[in-house]
Amino acid sequence: MSERLVNHIREERARLGLTQADLATMAQVSRKTINTVENGVFIPSTVLALRLARALGTNVESLFQIPDAGRPDSVGP
């Protein structure tokens, strides 16, 4: 079963005034990796999710959620 993963990386990055390149440097990955994660093309590893959270000054749970299965438009806890 494939679950959809919602992420808030773009919003957090924009809130901090960072470009994809800035975040990529901070997380030690390529800008393309940031782009593919933001667009839901690539689901990050645990290590990458932790690096992104650290770079954005937040926690993984704030960046990534699995939508509630009962309500497709909602985000679970």
Where are these regions (language model features)?
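Residue-level signal for the short linker/turn that defines the boundary of a DNA-recognition helix
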Residues: 7, 17-18, 44-47
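DNA major-groove recognition helix of helix-turn-helix/homeodomain DNA-binding modules
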Residues: 28, 47-62
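Short alpha-helical DNA-recognition segment
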Residues: 17-35
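A short, Lys/Arg-rich alpha-helix, primarily the initiator
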Residues: 1-15
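Short, charged recognition helix plus adjacent turn
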Residues: 64-77
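Alpha-helical residues within the helix-turn-helix
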Residues: 14, 25, 54
